[in-house]
A protein has these predicted regions:
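Short, compositionally biased serine/threonine- and acidic-rich segments at solvent-exposed termini, linkers
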Residues: 410-416
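Compositionally biased non-globular segments, especially hydrophobic aliphatic-rich helices
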Residues: 17-22, 144, 150, 187, ...
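Short hydrophobic/aromatic segments of transmembrane alpha-helices and their interfaces
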Residues: 4-5, 268, 418-420
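C-terminal outer-membrane/trafficking sorting elements
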Residues: 418-430, 434-507
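Bacterial N-terminal signal peptides that target proteins for export
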Residues: 1-9
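Bacterial N-terminal signal peptides
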Residues: 9-18
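Glycine-aromatic-enriched surface loops/turns that form tight recognition elements
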Residues: 21-111, 115-277, 283-410
Length: 507
């Protein structure tokens, strides 16, 4: 019987591995490696401590590129090929029309990227220079890998701001911003945000403002298409990304520290049968935005109908939908780690003074549902009665939470005796997925011969990490630098009891 159960485990394991490698929408990691509290960088918190569970605790698919040496860059995660160079700034219409005649490296099938394609190359190792008074851009760190892609800040000598490094996407907002402006989404790789920008001239005749932005063309198979399945248990799995989401949300606004604690409590409760939920990082959460939906056009949040979103009363007393926290800190040169990233699934509201200097403020959808901005992690929203920044971004601080987990990280157990992993068993190793090293945690309530072994996908024993007599809770580091990328099985044995978990090594 035990042999049969062991075979079943490997069948289930193989199926989960097949699912991992059939993902069509790989969400690369944000690149955030620093840890923060509400204001500044800190050492890495341990499980159970304040601020545990933020972005830097979890390593996803690491950004990986090949410079093809011909002016193009290939993303090894997404399969997309990118233009390496920085274009001249152009209007939205020019960005769309110029691609028809664009040829590079012998290819003529380039296109303007969608917002999800463009956001796939953002990095949150960047630092927002907003408010910085310097001029030497060599001191700045943008939100893109400049060892791979060419990048320029805004040209102050031409009257631009340093942060004017917006890039057009092809994604048009299904509603309008400001006072009825046709809008296209873009990514600002200088300050690390998604906003909707005017796609057409705005303003009175003869005084129109014409938005121009950089362009980085892309080619390759379609990227960023979700494949959601309602699991019928309060969760939704995206087969395309391999991520499982809770179907609902926190149903209450929380500051950032409270949001992390809320997720930790869900794990303590073994919510929906799982104890490895996390607050999503910025790229994971943006990955479930549905840019065909908005409060104005579909009377819904910008998310698919399998999900439910709390309805809030916005700053104008109207029904709207929340901002949702991510575990990603939005680092800033002036205030360090005070802000964290959120995704607006409702309208991205802002207070606009109209006309300027009139003292008359109007609340408008300034950036569009699906925008990515940031909020202070703590404080009192009333301290920002007319928002923050040039478009008066509303400050809420108490935002909502939707947790996520890796759909393929379910525990695998070999017998019915293993029902108390808090006494005997493996705890989720971290990071997972990992690059080179991962910390394996386990507990044992009595003395006895313990074996902690690592197997590859074929069932071959590759390493024995622990073999001895141990009691209590333990952590050991597995150095996998000598092994190839792939899925591995961690197996803890004590007498006739075993507990098995999967882990993914990515190099």
């Amino acid at each position: 019987m035990k042999h049969n159960l062991y075979q079943i485990c490997f069948i289930l394991f193989a199926l989960s591995v097949e699912a991992i490698y059939s993902q069509t929408y790989i969400v690369a990691d944000t690149g955030q490696e620093k840890f923060y509290n509400n204001t500044e960088e800190i050492t890495a918190p341990f499980p159970g401590e304040d601020y545990y569970g933020q972005d830097a605790h979890f390593d996803g698919y690491q950004p990986s590129y090949t410079d093809n040496g011909d002016g193009t860059i290939t993303d090894l995660n997404t399969g997309l090929m990118w233009q390496k160079a920085v274009s001249e700034k152009m209007t939205f219409d020019e960005a769309l029309s110029s691609v028809d005649a664009f040829s590079l490296a012998g290819y003529d099938d380039w296109r303007l990227p969608t917002i999800k394609e463009l956001y796939s190359i953002i990095l949150f190792s960047g630092v927002d220079p907003s408010g910085w008074q310097g001029s030497d851009t060599d001191l700045l760190t943008p939100f893109i890998d400049t060892a791979i892609f060419e990048f320029e800040y805004g040209d102050e000598s031409a009257g631009e701001r340093i942060i004017d490094a917006q890039y057009w996407s092809s994604t048009i907002y299904v509603s309008t911003t400001m006072n009825g402006n046709e809008t296209a989404f873009g990514v600002n790789f200088a300050d690390g945000r998604i906003k909707g920008y005017p796609a057409e001239p705005v303003g009175p005749p003869g005084q129109e403002f014409i938005m121009t932005s950089f362009v980085r063309y892309v080619r390759g198979s379609e990227y960023g298409v979700n494949d959601f399945t309602d699991n019928g248990s309060g969760s939704v799995t995206d087969q395309a990304t391999g991520l499982m989401w809770i179907q609902g949300d926190s149903e209450i606004g929380l500051n950032w520290e409270e949001a992390l604690s809320w997720v930790a409590q869900k794990n303590t409760e073994n919510y929906l049968g799982y104890s490895d939920w996390r607050m999503p990082n910025a790229k994971e959460l943006q990955g479930i935005v549905d840019y065909t939906r908005s409060p104005e056009t579909t009377n819904s949040a910008a998310i698919g109908p399998l999900f439910t979103c709390s309805v809030i009363t916005d700053e104008d007393g109207e029904d709207n939908y929340p901002f949702y926290w991510t575990g990603t800190t939005h680092a800033n040169m002036q205030v360090n780690g005070k802000y964290a990233v959120y995704i607006s699934f409702g309208e991205a509201l802002g207070w606009m003074e109209m006309p300027p200097n009139s003292g008359n403020f109007q609340l408008l959808d300034v950036h569009g549902a699906g925008a990515q901005r940031s909020d202070p992690k703590s404080g009192d929203p009333s301290d920002w009665p007319y928002g923050h920044g040039p478009q008066g971004d509303v400050i809420r601080i108490y935002n909502y939470v939707r947790c996520v987990r890796d759909a393929g990280s379910t525990d695998i157990e070999e017998n019915d005796d293993q029902n108390t992993p808090d006494k005997f068993g493996l705890i989720e190793n971290y990071p997972n997925p990992f690059n080179s090293t991962t910390t394996i945690r386990f507990s044992l309530e009595t003395h006895g011969d313990v074996s902690l072994q690592i197997y590859d996908i074929t069932g071959r024993l590759v390493e024995t990490v622990v073999n001895g007599t141990i009691r209590g809770e333990h952590e050991v580091v597995w150095d996998a630098s000598g092994y190839p990328s792939g899925v591995y099985l961690i197996r803890l044995s004590h007498g006739d009891r075993t507990h098995t978990r999967k882990t993914l090594l990515l190099k």
